[in-house]
């Protein structure tokens, strides 16, 4: 950068003279000044010319074009707990991955780890964006050639949804509409949608099949069902391949210890039971709160189907591989067996080796007594079966990551490439 300021030691005879509010500069100084401007302009023009001659100047990013044999997957919410594990699995399977996340719940450091694991050009890119911004989403689709979308991005806490229902309808239902409209506009033909067993509500008959009536009882489940309805209505007159995965309670982490669950501290009261157990075991919280002991179950606490995140992302990859144009697949993703909250806590005590203090509290709004899946359809049609079905072992895997990451990922935006 050129400096056009005068030195302080300059003589008075070379200074501008002011008269009547006008400056009359020394002609020699004026010529020198103009010469510098011309030199700068010439150098700039030369640089631009040379840059344009570079073979890479007009070469589009590999992410912006389709390539034979390469499947480019947009993973929304890919900086989050489940989304990052899905991105890891896709990258291991040689997919090209673009992560889009607004980082309201996700962790940039998870993206950095993925970038370090797969540094080769054209493997992974991260785009900071909010799916509620339709213009930003359209720009992303315009600049990238996606073959499929895995839509994970969503707020996902039952308790929080009862406190802030409008937030959930905006974030889940409205944002899914934006994604679907943009996919249609840009000819992206495959959607794998991350849904939830919360769309079923509290069925009278267990286990839950895909034919079980959907009667959600909280805004989270209702918002997800609305999003499903939008997708299903659109698919009736579209050649899009659609897979909807309704999964149950997610636990565990990457068996190799690269990724884990690191929710924001302010969301602890709404978080998963595994996170609450680990917080109590590490002394972050004084104990574990069990909300509700008067449900109509064997021990009075809620019964849930706990699915390991490794099995869950395996189901997503199989769904992607099996997706067919003009077809909609709807699948429950669970183990097929339920465990009570008390049983879960006992497994957590064994996994951590800590005698966790338990406080029993009244029920949490929007919860239901018993939910577990019948996974026979996904087993038959996608050849998928949960392999990590031992609660204690899944919790031990997650606990190892927690012990090594006492502050979560503990990294900032300066540590990751953001586009």
From Swiss-Prot:
GO biological process, one term: UDP-L-arabinose biosynthetic process
Binding positions (NAD(+)): 72-103
Enzyme Commission numbers on file: 5.1.3.5
Name by which UniProt lists this protein: UDP-arabinose 4-epimerase 1
Subcellular location: Golgi apparatus, Golgi stack membrane
UniProt keyword Isomerase, yes or no: yes
One term under GO cellular component: Golgi trans cisterna
Family in the record: Belongs to the NAD(P)-dependent epimerase/dehydratase family.
Organism: Arabidopsis thaliana
Pfam families from the UniProt entry: GDP_Man_Dehyd (PF16363)
Domain of life from the UniProt record: Eukaryota
Catalytic activity: UDP-beta-L-arabinopyranose = UDP-alpha-D-xylose
Described purpose of this protein according to its UniProt entry: Acts as a UDP-D-xylose 4-epimerase but lacks both UDP-D-glucose and UDP-D-glucuronic acid 4-epimerase activities in vitro.
Keyword Isomerase: yes
